[in-house]
Amino acid sequence: MKYIEIDEELYRFIASKTERIGESASDILRRLLNLSVENVDVSLPTDISHPSLESQSPVNRHPVFDQAKAAVEKVIADQNSANEHYPVDEDIASSTSIDFDAMVSQHLLSQQKGAVGRFMYLLSSLESTAGSDFDKVLNVQGKGRLYFARSKQALLNSSKSSNPKEIASSGFWVTTNNNTAKKQTILTEVLEHLGCDSERAKSIAEHI
């Protein structure tokens, strides 16, 4: 058994991937790297290596260490870059009865005023198509602020500059003070929450 030092971020990440009681860090890393889990001698060595106090020549490191470190750091980087992406509920069906293609009318889109108008038109069209499932939009939220609510005041309480607008006469309100890219992201998340596949959702949102 070899002992190495890792930084705090790597330690927390590895610990967060524990799937069962008693699983060791080696077991977790082997699973993440798709390596077979082997029985290893866990007896403590006479001398424990402290890499931070020793020469860090790459030649002296076991190649699996570099592979594991690179893999874990890549996963952490990917997760950090995706922080703005709001998770879709796990209980959402992969497909629903909603005809997402039917909600887009090029003729009606062309009559809307700016990105806000197109954003509101697409949400209104989706609301009329989704029916009672539309309340899933309430699950789409930003960091510390609401994007959808059942009242204008709720959005204003979340952000004074939210510029809330009601989606048709549905009783649902949406913030509209975001730039076009953010509106597209919000609509994409709404569509995914309602069962639309990711690629189609992005394609529809590009109409904003």
From Swiss-Prot:
Location(s), subcellular? Cytoplasm
Q: Keywords in alphabetical order, please.
A: Cytoplasm, DNA replication inhibitor, DNA-binding
Q: Where is this region: Interaction with DNA?
A: 115-116
Per the annotation, which location comes first and is thus the protein's main one? cytoplasm
Superkingdom of origin organism: Bacteria
**Pfam family name, one:** SeqA
Which GO annotations describe the biological process of this protein?
Answer: negative regulation of DNA-templated DNA replication initiation; regulation of DNA-templated transcription
Molecular function per GO: DNA binding
Q: What's in the GO CC field?
A: cytoplasm
Q: InterPro entries in the record, alphabetically?
A: Arc_rbn_hlx_hlx, Ribbon_hlx_hlx, SeqA, SeqA_DNA-bd_C, SeqA_DNA-bd_C_sf, SeqA_N
Coiled-coil regions listed: none
Cite the record's note on assembly: Homodimer. Polymerizes to form helical filaments.
NCBIfam families cross-referenced by the UniProt entry: PRK11187.1
The entry's function note states: Negative regulator of replication initiation, which contributes to regulation of DNA replication and ensures that replication initiation occurs exactly once per chromosome per cell cycle. Binds to pairs of hemimethylated GATC sequences in the oriC region, thus preventing assembly of replication proteins and re-initiation at newly replicated origins. Repression is relieved when the region becomes fully methylated.
Q: Which family does it belong to?
A: Belongs to the SeqA family.
Protein name in the entry: Negative modulator of initiation of replication
